[in-house]
Curated annotation (Swiss-Prot):
The lineage of its organism: Eukaryota, Metazoa, Chordata, Craniata, Vertebrata. Keywords: Biological rhythms, Glutamine amidotransferase, Phosphoprotein, Repeat, Transferase. It comes from Rattus norvegicus. It catalyses: D-fructose 6-phosphate + L-glutamine = D-glucosamine 6-phosphate + L-glutamate. The active site is at residue 2. Substrate binds at residues 376-377, 421-423, 426, 577. It is an enzyme of class 2 (transferase). Controls the flux of glucose into the hexosamine pathway. Most likely involved in regulating the availability of precursors for N- and O-linked glycosylation of proteins. Regulates the circadian expression of clock genes BMAL1 and CRY1. Has a role in fine tuning the metabolic fluctuations of cytosolic UDP-GlcNAc and its effects on hyaluronan synthesis that occur during tissue remodeling. Residues 295-662 are annotated as: Isomerase. Its EC number is 2.6.1.16. Gene3D superfamilies: Glucose-6-phosphate isomerase like protein, domain 1 (3.40.50.10490), Glutamine Phosphoribosylpyrophosphate, subunit 1, domain 1 (3.60.20.10). This is Glutamine--fructose-6-phosphate aminotransferase [isomerizing] 1. Pathway: Nucleotide-sugar biosynthesis; UDP-N-acetyl-alpha-D-glucosamine biosynthesis; alpha-D-glucosamine 6-phosphate from D-fructose 6-phosphate: step 1/1. It comes from the Eukaryota.
Amino acid sequence: MCGIFAYLNYHVPRTRREILETLIKGLQRLEYRGYDSAGVGLDGGNDKDWEANACKIQLIKKKGKVKALDEEVHKQQDMDLDIEFDVHLGIAHTRWATHGEPSPVNSHPQRSDKNNEFIVIHNGIITNYKDLKKFLESKGYDFESETDTETIAKLVKYMYDNWESQDVSFTTLVERVIQQLEGAFALVFKSVHFPGQAVGTRRGSPLLIGVRSEHKLSTDHIPILYRTGKDKKGSCGLSRVDSTTCLFPVEEKAVEYYFASDASAVIEHTNRVIFLEDDDVAAVVDGRLSIHRIKRTARDHPGRAVQTLQMELQQIMKGNFSSFMQKEIFEQPESVVNTMRGRVNFDDYTVNLGGLKDHIKEIQRCRRLILIACGTSYHAGMATRQVLEELTELPVMVELASDFLDRNTPVFRDDVCFFISQSGETADTLMGLRYCKERGALTVGITNTVGSSISRETDCGVHINAGPEIGVASTKAYTSQFVSLVMFALMMCDDRISMQERRKEIMLGLKRLPDLIKEVLSMDDEIQKLATELYHQKSVLIMGRGYHYATCLEGALKIKEITYMHSEGILAGELKHGPLALVDKLMPVIMIIMRDHTYAKCQNALQQVVARQGRPVVICDKEDTETIKNTKRTIKVPHSVDCLQGILSVIPLQLLAFHLAVLRGYDVDFPRNLAKSVTVE
């Protein structure tokens, strides 16, 4: 939801202008997450001595787009942009309103007081903020915003003002604060009392740190420091930070640190990152990065690795396309190849998902598969349920994560639970994962983000390798999730003689899939023409059954998300149980009819719609002469094996949604009220 970005330069001279450009660009890379306002916090003052400027913090906040914030920055009369800083921390934030309407005062950074002694940026929701606010108000603290985050900033100041000794560390203050917080958060703090220092922490929301230096780093594995005991007067109670317990450039050379909600904001600066775990507190003091935890638990890993990201800047740029969504739709021939690369051997008809190989025997012995997800990821589970049931011969449940939790669904030790999420941070799906782990089920993650919470907390998993997806409306991640689940089904039945012919048929379908997707994408002009006939409508119905019911749901979701038209995916078998009442000559209807086991029943549904003066547009097999001959308007897609046909039938709906949104004048990549990464429940 919200986007966090912070930049600390240590002995790397940067002008205020350069620092602001870095912060603004970081926020622009996070725009796809969704937001309604933005802000930055940096050292104020115009003294030639940067250390004097660090005693004052300046906040600039603006409702609306990051571009509006950038314009506001350059309107500041009292800020010399050419002042140079040898050491500086700047923090920046894109806010998605949860507590309080979008406005400058509710935007982040939030401050502790009018002197900006402590400021903080926050992604998440603090569930006990009302109690904390009541306590702080009783101590004389005045609140200016409606946000839960302001309580955090004021709580740090309260701790600082009431600390027994004068030598408290910034890290200790933050540790004490997060012990009082309930809910989900990723936080980065800045203070006039600790110039040039940064402290970041997370619980339930993502946070990573990028490291950039021209010099060799002291380690590629940062050990965790634990509290040694109770705080004593004159002591912070922490394990000692020294050259063996922190990260820094050898010989104390120049270094830059980037705190961010996800990798897209740091990749243009560095590909070396550290992913923080829940309750980690990361501190940069004198250019050295250390990671602290309050308590030691049995499952704690002894350190945090410096990882190298396999991502390039060009992957998160639009290139020659008008929007990220359009680019991602047209990347699907390559993204499905990347999903299969190194995993499917078309010569000997084998599938090897490396992330599952150590657990595949255990999965094959299970009693039930449960697929848990939200939104488009849920539809990917729905789309592959039938082939999973067919090839595994196991009962397969597909659950919306929020409903799964609301029902306290029974889960057993011999269940295998899949958690599907593009970002790997979806809050409801993550809560479902923890629910299933508590009950002893084997957990499997299917994500598109290396180092995400779901990929780390599951027992095993599959990385779909679709590449960064920036557009809020998911497209290529859906088809890659689809292919990943089909590959899993093929892996599950590789030793069953009775399944071998079916496996070969599906694998030949996978081999041809990229070329068939290209063929569907070549129909873009035809679909754009259809969009010009539909964009003024208020509603659209999409009907299908069997493998294509999930396609109807996904197509309807895409249209809802970015065109703001009412759209509904309808199971064709349910037509007579209510939806048929909506059909008349004015209601736009799209039907999906493919030559599979539901063909005759879909033809029956088509006749029912036509009999009510409906004028359906039919997405059908290009070899289906009967449907083409008897229907006035068709979109003809190439034929594939039945369980993969849903990939080819969903792409025309993705293109239709895109063109409808453009014709209606809406921002395709950033639809209103929606965020790419839903990190709060």
